[in-house]
């Protein structure tokens, strides 16, 4: 069999549209229902993580791209964290709470997180996608370089996920 070239741009547009439709209360129609069971999503997600090969960085960057290109469009810069929390809840990613906000640093809590809710203590953080989503969304809205690192996770036996968000001084765009 010959190599089949995947149309990554078409897939990217499809994912972007599906997320936008979900946020706008128009999820794609499907005979079996619009949502997959959390256990199936987590099985695939954790299966990918166990493959190794630096996949965590890839998952983080996917989250960052989606945050920057999709989620940020629905977040109000003047009401940044509150509107971001609304979007994450609406997209069923998790319930965002603010623990600390300073000029160049935040600590954000994510409860009922899609990647690790009800996961047993496996000894490591699991929410690289959510960390990327936080970084990408805030980076786009603040026009500053942002990095988010998960410091607490249900995958480490914690009750919720916690992210340390570092914001660089330099403005861009």
UniProtKB/Swiss-Prot annotation:
SMART domains: V4R (SM00989). Signal peptide: none annotated. Belongs to the M.jannaschii MJ0150/MJ0739/MJ0745/MJ1460/MJ1642 family. PANTHER family: ARSR FAMILY TRANSCRIPTIONAL REGULATOR, DNA-DIRECTED RNA POLYMERASE SUBUNIT I. This is Uncharacterized protein MJ0150.
């Amino acid at each position: 069999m010959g190599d089949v070239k995947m149309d990554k741009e078409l897939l990217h547009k499809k994912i972007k549209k599906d997320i936008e439709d979900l946020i706008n209360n128009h999820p794609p129609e499907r005979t079996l229902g619009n949502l997959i069971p959390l256990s199936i999503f987590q099985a695939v997600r954790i299966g990918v993580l166990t493959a190794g090969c630096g996949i965590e960085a890839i998952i983080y960057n996917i989250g960052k791209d989606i945050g920057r290109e999709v989620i940020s469009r629905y977040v109000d810069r003047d009401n940044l964290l509150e509107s971001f929390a609304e979007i994450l809840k609406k997209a069923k990613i998790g319930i965002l709470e603010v623990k600390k906000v300073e000029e160049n640093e935040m600590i954000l809590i994510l409860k009922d997180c899609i990647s690790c809710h009800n996961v047993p203590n496996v000894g490591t953080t699991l929410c690289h996608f959510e960390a990327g989503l936080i970084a990408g969304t805030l980076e786009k809205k603040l026009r500053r370089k942002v990095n988010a690192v998960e410091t607490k996770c249900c995958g480490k036996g914690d009750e919720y996920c916690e992210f340390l968000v570092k914001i660089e001084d330099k403005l861009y765009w």
